[in-house]
């Protein structure tokens, strides 16, 4: 693995540490309806004295969650004195790879990336790491953490989420019936975790029948086409688990 992380400018390292702490606190407080003035006070603790340039990318702005992530990054960027440039993944591994190749050809104080698929961005991300640019891996693995030396990896517990949602669905239908799981992108480590959580629960219910587990790649149009077919093929569907809100 690269050891370039040790070359990070001390001022930038301190900012990234503050960003993680203040950003996590701010996101949590925002969830409780905290006023913007308080968010600004929180951000002031980690604000950079020097204007920083950051590159961001997520799977695709067509997804509501990703669009909200962009809005959040730009909002906190203003508070932390960071200029945010966005590289849209467009819910396409090849298109995101092209965007990240472009990102890697430029200089940044740091980059934050949510990959559409694991292993699709390794080369350009490694190029940035080798150039001394700290890369924050968000939500899904860019590559296994023993294969690429990202600055940090931030993700929810997708297995737990998948299991919790599935348990609620199974309880709602009385522990028996027909269920469908519509997955996100199969190469997305978050989707993989949600599927693991799903199967860890349904295996305990012998009267549950899984009718279909096709992916729809987080895409609303693909989901609609898939479900037009599913509703024709299966006259009795008791529950459905979708890997994100938009598909549901």
Tell where the protein language model's regions lie, with residue ranges:
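Short beta-strand elements in bilobed, periplasmic/extracellular small-molecule ligand-binding domains
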Residues: 79-89, 204-216, 220
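Residue-level recognition of beta-strand->loop/alpha-helix junctions
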Residues: 58, 86-90, 114, 139, ...
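Short acidic/histidine-rich motifs immediately flanking catalytic phosphotransfer sites
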Residues: 103-110, 234-237
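Flexible loop/hinge segments that line or gate small-molecule binding clefts
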Residues: 119-160, 171, 178, 184
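An alpha-beta-alpha
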Residues: 54-62, 70-75, 163-213
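N-terminal secretory signal peptides
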Residues: 1-11, 21-38
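Hydrophobic alpha-helical
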Residues: 115-130, 198, 212, 216-248
């Amino acid at each position: 693995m690269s050891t370039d992380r040790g070359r990070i400018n001390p001022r930038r390292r301190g900012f990234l540490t503050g960003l993680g702490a203040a950003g996590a606190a701010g996101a949590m407080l925002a969830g409780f309806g905290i006023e913007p003035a308080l968010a600004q006070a929180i951000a002031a603790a980690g604000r950079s004295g020097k204007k920083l340039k950051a590159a961001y990318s997520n799977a695709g702005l067509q997804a509501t969650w990703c669009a909200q992530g962009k809005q959040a990054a730009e909002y906190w960027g203003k508070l932390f004195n960071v200029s945010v440039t966005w590289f849209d993944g467009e819910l396409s591994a090849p298109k995101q790879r092209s965007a990240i190749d472009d990102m890697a050809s430029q200089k940044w104080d740091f980059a934050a990336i949510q990959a559409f698929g694991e292993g699709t961005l390794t080369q350009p991300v490694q190029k940035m790491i080798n150039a001394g640019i700290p890369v924050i891996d968000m939500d899904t693995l860019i590559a296994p953490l023993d294969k690429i030396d990202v600055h940090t990896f931030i993700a929810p517990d997708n297995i737990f989420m998948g299991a919790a949602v599935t348990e609620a669905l199974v309880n709602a239908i009385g522990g028996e019936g027909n269920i469908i799981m519509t997955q996100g992108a199969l190469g997305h480590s978050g989707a993989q975790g949600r599927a693991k959580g799903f199967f860890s629960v349904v295996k305990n219910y012998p009267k549950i029948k899984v009718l279909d587990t096709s992916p729809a790649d987080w895409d609303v149009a693909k989901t609609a086409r898939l479900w037009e077919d599913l509703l024709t093929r299966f006259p009795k569907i008791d529950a459905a688990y979708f890997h994100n809100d938009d598909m549901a």
